[in-house]
Amino acid sequence: MGGLQNVRSAALIGHNGSGKSLLLAQILYKSGLIDKADTKYVDYDPVEEEKGASFSSHVASLEWKGKKVYLIDTPGFSDFISEVINGIFVSENIISVVNAVAGVEIQTERTWNMADEMKKPIIVFVNQMDKERANFENVVAELKERFSRKIVPVVVPIGAAENFEGVVDLLKKKAYRYDGDKVQEEDMPESFNDMRSEILEDIVEQDEELMMRYLDGEDIGYDELMRVLKEGYKKGEIVPVLSGSALKGIGLDLLLDYLGDIGVSPEEAPSYKALLEDGTEIEVKFSEEEPFCAYIFKSVVDQFVGRITFAKVIAGVLRPGDTVVNVQKDVTEKVGHVYVPILKQQKEVESAGPGEIVVLLKLKEGAVGETLAHRDRRVKIVPPAFPEPMFSRSVHPKSKSDIDKISSGLSRLSDSDPTFVWEYDPETGETVVSGLGAMHLDVMIERLKKIFGVDVEVGKPKIAYRETITTTAVAEHKHKKQTGGHGQYGHVKIQLEPLPRGQGYEFVDKIVGGVIPRNFIPSVDKGIREAMKKGVLAGYPVTDVRVILFDGSYHEVDSSDISFQIAAIQAFKKGMEAAKPVILEPIMEVEVFVPEENAGDVMGEISSRRGRPLGMEPSGKGMVKVKAEVPLAEMLDFSSKLSSITSGRGYFTMRFQRYEIVPPNIQEKIIEERRREMQEQEK
């Protein structure tokens, strides 16, 4: 069974509810690796167990007719698309699982397009043929309508719903009827001849010589048909379609047969792009002779075991006791045991070569997207592109004892998911987590609680507002304090002027004649900077102000650094109040990608959020890109609304553009809310 040619890996992709997890569980049960065909063996994450759904990818290895097979079950929810992206990235084959009742759904289309972008060949498995209203012909017609690749049904159902009893392999001309674990093989009924003739034409047209023989009336043999089917599949030109039922275990053996017979092996697969230490781009091919290299595509934090790392071996061979380097972190790791995954169990192996998936325990580092490599060739595999996390919430530990634990827990969780990030904002004093949607953050926060024991309160993150002035004003303040010994004396006159947006702060010294000694000028500057930390309207930092120090006075004995700082602080506050202050808000440059039919609704939604649409342009595959500028305060729940408008097909990116003045009616609300906040803090 050794050798690259005998390894197969496939990612199971599709919409939530298409039956991917049950399909994997049934395959493992039929292979004798688990006791029962139950998704509880697949969804073993503590949050998944509680909610009964898949929120992460699950990996299993098995042996099938002389092949080492690795299957990656990916989640069907769009919020967990990073798991799908990585699953596709490390698989040489893709199995798109389609619900025979619902047909092509949103995630069917989105994940298919991802496989297209990564140039991965696709097999379709039409699942749930035993369900009421299952319709194989409708699904095939929909696949042909939606996707550009040639759709070729090769394993078709016998009956449907309660009459579903088996499948026909049109190429082998064999029918398979299932009765529990028993399978009866028989010749293909004549009623399937027309269907077979139709798909033969689709296959033989891939090979000109074969097509001529077929047109001359020659009966093309099974081996030649499979050879041409494999060539078309490998090139991404043909999509073989199979059918069955994961629940009843029908057609799964044929699915594995086709994966073994036409599936792409590591030996036939394209190379991975990588970077050398000096930034030179190279390609790393699947090879036992090359120095070791593996890509980390999954990282799990287990409350008992610790860090569990899943890696795809691309080059070289990994053995227990080997020393490897985490290239991104520049950390040397000593590999203890080497395992292959069987869901939450692991099987220890003596070695793992190219194309195989390994599980490593208790590595010091190992975030998703990082590379483990031989110390003499520290290559970094270029990871796939992940969507930017745009849905944010603030989190606060419910217990003071959890303050130290929250950073550690969030860091470990972000290691496991490149679309989950967190940061502490010193300006607002908040810890802010960001992900791809409300469900995404809910699951990550639940994991924080169940795995790390940190319970948090969740809220909308505070907006980093600013305050500024809109006109020129002059102010002065004389700070005078007499005590028993030395007193305090500082006197400043300043002029405040608005600066162009984004200029920050400028201090101008126009003192002449020594009315304020040179050694106290920095004290005035320091006092003004301190005053600018809290504006007079709502206590937000002040920006875009020029302060000119033009006059003042001092006392030979009582003047000091602190005296001039206090005088400057008070003078600045007076000046700002007189200079017609306003609140500024961050404006984001937003790009929204939506289906063409939803563009109008999305433009309207943007306008209702005080946004300015800037234009629209095609972005391919029936999608358009809407460009706009929108206040950040209006984008906090946009992700959920966009998902609702586009049925989960839309997504967006945004980046900070500039600050702008808040409209007066909005400013009043911000000031009132800020006052309530400060009153709460004082209690």
From Swiss-Prot:
One GO term in the molecular function aspect is: GTP binding
Superkingdom to which the source organism belongs: Bacteria
Cross-referenced Gene3D superfamilies, in alphabetical order? 3.30.230.10, 3.30.70.240, Elongation Factor G (Translational Gtpase), domain 3, P-loop containing nucleotide triphosphate hydrolases, Translation factors
In the UniProt record, does the keyword tRNA-binding occur? no
Q: Name one GO biological process term.
A: ribosome disassembly
The residues covered by the tr-type G domain are 5-267
The keyword Nucleotide-binding appears for this protein: yes
Q: Which UniProt keywords apply?
A: GTP-binding, Nucleotide-binding
Q: Which residues bind GTP?
A: 14-21, 73-77, 127-130
InterPro entries named among the record's database cross-references: EF-G-like_DII, EFG_II, EFG_III, EFG_III/V, EFG_IV, EFG_V, EFG_V-like, P-loop_NTPase
Q: Which PANTHER family match?
A: ELONGATION FACTOR G-LIKE PROTEIN, TRANSLATION ELONGATION FACTOR G-RELATED
Family to which this protein belongs: Belongs to the TRAFAC class translation factor GTPase superfamily. Classic translation factor GTPase family. EF-G/EF-2 subfamily.
- Show the NCBIfam families listed in the entry: EF-G (TIGR00484), PRK12740.1-3 (NF009379), PRK12740.1-5 (NF009381), PRK13351.1-1 (NF009891), small_GTP (TIGR00231)
Protein name per the record:
Elongation factor G-like protein
